Amino acid sequence: DASACNFDALATDNDGTCDYCSCFITTSDTEGYGVDVEVHAVDGVAGYTTYRVYATTASADDFVSAVTGFSGAPLEVQTTGTFFQSSIGGVTPSVVTDLLLGFVPDLAYDSWVTVGLDRKADSGMGEEDAATVSGVSPSWTVGFESGNDITINDGTGGGWYVLNSASNGIAGDDQRVLLGQFTTDGDLSGSMRIQVFPNGNSGMDLRYVASFGAPSCGCTDPDALNPDLDAAYDDGSCEYPGCTDSEADNYDAGADV
């Protein structure tokens, strides 16, 4: 099943191991361009999971310039919980250095937005820190730094970007560019309008919208104690009543409680 997280294009027979709940569902309105979401750390901050979101491109020399949103194509990065923000972190990782990480370990799990970097830019390598822009006051950055969602849906718009001279905007051999790190105690989802210059040509301005979210997983058995009527995939969490004592005459191997 091509929609499974562990889809194997070389497989000829379904062995029943398809997994639908360990990865994110992603969509894009442009073929060859999209987003990836990966788990970067679990419990780096107790009770939180750190995710990294990447733009994926069609070519290694594609240049990712900006992530934006406005009323016609909102930019949203949302959680059902809160985003962790380190006390010395920023909206971008421009303050992250080895020295500071040694003094403040939780800075490694700070939530931030970026283009291609997970620490302070190295100008000697042609790197540039991402800049942010907002069309309204207060800026979206204020709420985000307080642990809230990113939502940019006004008429003027906003987002983050790098100049064409920044080496960190180039996709490279893995054909992807880091767009953000988000540490949350909830479910992560979002939608981004991503600007790309195909093959590094700024005269070819491509803007695509990509979305991501966790699959709807839960107990799909209506006869279980904890059915989830909204779940699309069963994640093995169903609970069944019965005797759980293996020494008893009426032991039920399928019982949980």
Tell what function each PLM region has.
Residues 1-257:
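Primarily marks secretory-pathway-exposed extracellular/lumenal segments that are disulfide-
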